[in-house]
A protein has these predicted regions:
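A short, Lys/Arg-enriched amphipathic alpha-helix from helix-turn-helix/homeodomain DNA-binding modules
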Residues: 137-173, 195, 199-200
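Generic protein-terminus/edge-of-domain signal
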Residues: 1-35
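Short alpha-helical "recognition helix" segments of helix-turn-helix
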Residues: 174-183
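Short acidic-glycine-tyrosine-enriched beta hairpin
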Residues: 42-57
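Short beta-strand segments in beta-sandwich/barrel cores
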Residues: 27, 34-39, 52-53, 61
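A cytosolic small-molecule/anion-sensing beta-strand core signal
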Residues: 32-33, 48-49, 67
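Ligand-binding loop in jelly-roll beta-barrel domains
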Residues: 59-90
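An amphipathic alpha-helical interaction segment
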Residues: 93-149
Length: 202
């Protein structure tokens, strides 16, 4: 069932990489813990804990959720005739909007209380002004290349390397080529890391 407004409380125990596609709904994404990365055009933006990001309907993007990431998301159907922001970007949530999202996470799905809260969320969202800003982490992620000594944590470097391995696999590269290019020919390490980060073999 597709509702006009929906709230999702999602956990990603493993690396989750979504294909680039146009958004079918307007979405407000907030990261509770972990890290999400959204790619718009050729730029990637890190969405860190406590940050809120607006994705308008029709926006071409791809989302990456790092392992152990917890997010809240409100989706608004195109059936709604309200004037939602058409620009993707970070938003500074009002105190009320933050409180509403926190309350929604503890409220029974599709209950009368949740529906009332979602109606107020919609009114708050209609007043947002999204803008794109490059944080220090976003800049490092955009500059990162396999094997380079970027100023990022070992964990993030590992996740970005495995995301690159997945991309190579999808483009038709053989496993032996991926292992040689990204893991110095160490097949055992590659297989172990795939299970650790993806929860399965690539």
């Amino acid at each position: 069932m597709n509702y006009a407004i929906e709230f999702h409380d999602a956990n990603y125990p493993f690396l989750n990489v979504a294909a680039r596609k146009k958004s079918l709904k307007h979405s407000l994404l907030s990261v509770v813990s972990g890290l999400a990365i959204i790619k718009l055009g050729k730029q990637e933006y890190a969405i860190e804990p406590g940050q809120y990001f607006w994705i308008p309907q029709g926006c071409l993007s791809s989302l990456t959720f790092l392992p152990n990431t917890h997010v809240h998301r409100c989706d608004f159907s195109v059936r709604l005739n309200d004037a939602f922001a058409q620009q993707a970007g970070f938003i500074k949530p009002s105190i009320l909007l933050k409180a509403l999202i926190e309350k929604l996470a503890k409220t029974e799905t599709r209950s009368d209380i949740q529906l009332d809260l979602l109606a107020v969320v919609k009114h708050e969202v209609l007043a947002i002004s999204p803008n794109l800003s490059n944080s220090a982490l976003s800049q490092v992620i955009n500059q990162w290349k396999p094997g380079c000594e970027a100023r990022i944590s070992r964990e993030l470097c590992l996740v970005l390397t495995l995301r690159e391995a997945r991309k190579m696999k999808l483009s038709g590269k053989k496993e032996s080529q991926i292992v040689e290019h990204l893991f110095a020919g160490n097949t055992e390490e590659y297989e172990q890391l795939c299970f650790l980060v993806f929860g399965e073999a690539l």
